[in-house]
């Protein structure tokens, strides 16, 4: 900066360009000579632009010199110098800072490079490990393949050896069979030859003894003829003498006639008495063919199960609705029927006929049995489907059932299940003559009230009954599907019967996990919508099956809910299988339409 401030000034150099100007000619304002101008005129525009880049413009230096002179003459020259020094120091500091930053960036880059190298090395090691594992797996596969090939080869060798052995055995067996066949053939030939020789010898002997044999036959026939004639003569003589003696003695004639009359009377009397006794025994001791189940004493059944009959004789009347879960209004009505039936038996009044209709599995048969036990009556169950196969014997069988019912001293509750099978409408239904005759016999035996038996009919489709059957009914009770509260009560009942009681009894393979039974039953009651009481009871049996099928014999909440969900799905599937006619019948029975074909169920 000293040259700017005027220090250490040197002498001005002589202007060398002047000499060049003088020797080369006058210069133009741009400092170019005439030779240059002439040369430039000969150059192209691109060449001229390239030449202008190497030319020096001294005007900038002149302006800098003028600025330096102005600065030296200024009174603030020292402050400007200090300011320039400070600016220079600041720039130096900034430069050093940038250098440090660059060095830090370089170090960071080195660290990053090392990290990348380590990462690459780690990836390389992982890849090498993977490659080694793949090679090991490949080697293992190869070894397994070789081992399998060896096993296959050994198996083929064994099969080949076995095949050869079987072929050898077959050849030996064939040779043995051929040997045996040859022996049999030779024996047969020998036997035929021997038989031929024997027959020839016998024929030769017969030809030689022909006269002797004919004489024997002639003598034998003559003797037989003489014997037969003598027997006929003797029998005729005896019979003639007896007839002559009887006809001449009237006392013997009367005695013979009386004996024959008594013999005929005894035969026919024994035959009639046997029929009467057999019918009496059948009515008092046995049971009719149509009756499938009864609580009346049967001698043969008592011999088979004596303990069962002793327990039944000692049993006391129970509540008619014990163990039966129904709608409260329906329970109230059934209880009234049970009380009225019991008082009717006590007072020897006339029993009323009852029709119980509704979906299957809603407790109709169970209530009929409970009603008979509560009233102290005997019960008998017959199925309407058993009448049609009997054909012409159906009328006789129905009369036997009612005759048998009249012989009960305690009163009989006759329960006809699936009664619509043979009590159909005679006008619209196409029924056979035998079934029509059986229906007429049933109508004849139920035309009046009876103090000996009570008739209870059960049907899923009561609209198919003949009008005369409806006229003989005094009470019609509809059994509906259980509601939410009834389902929960049923679930609690069967959970106690099939789960809690066996678990409390200490069964070997029956353990119960700890969970909230009441809450679980409430959940299942919501899931079992549309299910009947029978289906819910089968659900209880499925819980036992789940315990017996498990490894540890422990019943958990999950197992209970899974079985319930499966039962609900099966119920929906059964409903989906119904035809259009069955869906209409289902709607008429339950009052609700069957579910759609799609199976959707909310899982607990």
Swiss-Prot record:
Residues 1-50 are annotated as: Disordered. Residues 62-221 form a coiled coil. It holds the Pfam family ATAD3_N. One of its GO terms (biological process) is mitochondrion organization. Transmembrane segments: none annotated. Residues 29-50 have a biased composition (Basic and acidic residues). It comes from the Eukaryota. It is found in: Mitochondrion inner membrane; Mitochondrion matrix, Mitochondrion nucleoid. Gene3D superfamilies: P-loop containing nucleotide triphosphate hydrolases (3.40.50.300). Disulfide bonds: none annotated. ATP binds at residues 358-365. GO terms for cellular component: mitochondrial inner membrane; mitochondrial nucleoid; mitochondrion. Residues 8-19 have a biased composition (Polar residues). GO terms for molecular function: ATP binding; ATP hydrolysis activity. The keyword DNA repair does not apply. Keywords: ATP-binding, Coiled coil, Membrane, Mitochondrion, Mitochondrion inner membrane, Mitochondrion nucleoid, Nucleotide-binding. The keyword Coiled coil applies. Its main location: mitochondrion. Can form homooligomers. Required to maintain the proper number of mitochondria in neurons and muscles. This is ATPase family AAA domain-containing protein 3A homolog. It comes from Drosophila melanogaster (Fruit fly). The gene is bor.
């Amino acid at each position: 900066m000293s040259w700017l401030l005027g220090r250490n000034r040197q002498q001005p150099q002589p202007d060398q360009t002047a000499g060049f100007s003088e020797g080369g000619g006058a210069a133009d304002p741009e400092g170019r000579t005439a030779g240059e101008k002439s040369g430039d005129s000969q150059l192209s525009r691109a060449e001229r632009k390239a030449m202008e880049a190497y030319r020096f413009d001294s005007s900038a230096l002149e302006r800098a010199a003028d600025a330096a002179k102005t600065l030296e003459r200024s009174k603030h020259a020292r402050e400007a110098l200090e300011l320039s020094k400070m600016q220079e120091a600041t720039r130096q500091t900034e430069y050093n800072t940038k250098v440090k930053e660059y060095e830090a960036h370089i170090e960071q880059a080195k660290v990053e490079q090392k990290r990348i190298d380590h990462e690459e090395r780690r990836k390389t090691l992982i890849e090498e490990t993977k490659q080694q594992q793949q090679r090991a797996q490949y080697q293992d596969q190869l070894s397994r393949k070789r081992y399998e090939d060896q096993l296959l080869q050994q198996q083929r060798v064994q099969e080949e050896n076995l095949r050869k052995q079987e072929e050898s055995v077959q050849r030996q067996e064939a040779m043995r069979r051929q040997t045996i066949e040859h022996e049999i053939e030779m024996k047969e030939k020998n036997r035929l030859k021997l038989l031929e020789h024997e027959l020839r010898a016998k024929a030769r002997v017969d030809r030689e003894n022909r006269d002797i044999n004919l004489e024997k036959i002639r003598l034998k026939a003559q003797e037989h003829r003489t014997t037969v004639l003598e027997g006929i003569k003797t029998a005729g003589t005896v019979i003639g003498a007896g007839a002559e003696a009887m006809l001449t003695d009237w006392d013997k004639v009367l005695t013979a006639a009386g004996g024959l009359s008594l013999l005929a009377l005894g035969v026919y009397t024994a035959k009639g008495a046997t029929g009467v006794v057999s019918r009496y025994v059948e009515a008092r001791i046995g049971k009719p063919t149509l009756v499938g189940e009864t609580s009346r004493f049967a001698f043969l059944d008592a011999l088979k199960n004596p303990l069962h009959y002793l327990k039944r004789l000692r049993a006391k009347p129970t509540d008619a609705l014990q163990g039966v879960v129904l709608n409260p209004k329906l329970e109230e009505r059934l209880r009234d029927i049970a009380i009225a039936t019991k008082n009717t038996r006590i007072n020897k009044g006339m029993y009323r006929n009852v029709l119980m209709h509704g979906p299957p599995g809603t407790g109709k048969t169970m209530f009929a049995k409970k009603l008979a036990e509560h009233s102290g009556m005997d019960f008998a169950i017959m199925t309407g489907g058993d009448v049609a196969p009997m054909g012409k014997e159906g009328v006789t069988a129905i009369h036997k059932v009612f005759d048998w019912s009249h012989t009960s001293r305690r009163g009989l509750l006759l329960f006809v299940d699936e009664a619509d099978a043979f009590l159909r409408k005679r006008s619209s239904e196409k029924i056979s003559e035998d079934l029509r005759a059986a229906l007429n016999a049933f109508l004849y035996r139920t035309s009046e009230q009876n103090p000996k038996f009570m008739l209870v009919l059960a049907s899923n489709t009561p609209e198919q009954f003949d009008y005369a059957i409806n006229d003989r009914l005094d009470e019609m009770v509809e059994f509906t599907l259980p509601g939410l509260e009834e389902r929960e009560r049923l679930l609690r009942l069967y959970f106690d019967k099939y789960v809690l009681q066996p678990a409390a009894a200490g069964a070997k393979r029956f353990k119960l996990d700890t969970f909230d039974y009441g809450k679980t039953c409430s959940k299942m009651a919501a899931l079992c919508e549309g299910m009947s009481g029978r289906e819910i009871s089968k659900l209880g049996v499925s819980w036992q099956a789940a315990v017996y099928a498990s490894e540890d014999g422990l019943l958990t909440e999950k197992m209970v809910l899974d079985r319930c969900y499966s039962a609900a799905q099966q119920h929906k599937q059964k409903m989906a299988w119904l035809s259009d006619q069955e869906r209409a019948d289902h709607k008429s029975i339950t009052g609700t339409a069957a579910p759609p074909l799609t199976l959707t169920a909310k899982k607990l």
